[in-house]
């Protein structure tokens, strides 16, 4: 699978990298974010949102659990939803199921999920075409190593020229 690494020396650098990477996303994509408290998950999503043309302020949905924004760019994603989901407070499968993740995944937009390790409580695979894992690893006061790995992509289209 495909992977990319980047060393960020500041929150602004993390946002800029995420904004640039956002331009490569396709419809029906889920981005799973992993990292300790304060590692920069929300900062990364803020940059992702900026790269998708979201102009509203992007804040962590720790208490509301989900925020929805409308993607403005690139053209292949324009008008689709960007879901920012924070699973930090989720402790049980029942809590996870009340979020309506099935409905979110059916909307074919982009879902960015903080504290993605909590998805293990869900007990089923994610019904999405494109799945990315993003690990944010602090290596200094402001420095972060960002590792992005493609976890799942749709099979190549069948050859219909025969």
Describe the residue ranges of each PLM region.
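Short phosphate-coordinating micro-motif centered on Lys-Gly-acidic
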Residues: 2-5, 91-162
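Short beta-strand-centered segment that lines the nucleotide-binding/catalytic pocket of NTP-utilizing
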Residues: 54-69
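P-loop (Walker A) phosphate-binding loop of NTP-binding proteins
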Residues: 36
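Phosphate-binding P-loop
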Residues: 21-28
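Hydrophobic anchor at the beta1->P-loop junction of P-loop NTPases
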Residues: 31-33
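Conserved lysine of the Walker
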Residues: 41
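N-terminal pre-Walker A segment at the start of P-loop NTPase domains
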Residues: 1-20
């Amino acid at each position: 699978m495909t992977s990319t690494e980047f060393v960020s020396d500041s929150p602004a650098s993390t946002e800029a990298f995420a904004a640039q990477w956002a331009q490569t996303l396709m419809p029906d994509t889920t981005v799973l974010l992993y990292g300790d408290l304060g590692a920069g998950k929300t900062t990364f999503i803020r940059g992702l949102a900026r790269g998708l043309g979201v102009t509203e302020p992007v804040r962590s949905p720790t208490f509301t659990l989900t925020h929805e924004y409308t993607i403005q760019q690139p053209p292949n994603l324009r008008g689709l939803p960007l879901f920012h989901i924070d699973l930090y407070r989720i402790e049980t499968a029942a809590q996870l199921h009340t979020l309506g993740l099935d409905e979110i995944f059916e909307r074919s937009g982009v879902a960015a999920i903080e504290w993605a390790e909590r998805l293990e409580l869900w007990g089923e695979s994610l019904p999405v075409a494109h799945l990315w894992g993003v690990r944010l690893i602090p290596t200094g006061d402001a420095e972060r190593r960002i590792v992005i790995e493609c976890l799942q992509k749709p099979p190549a289209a069948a050859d219909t020229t025969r």
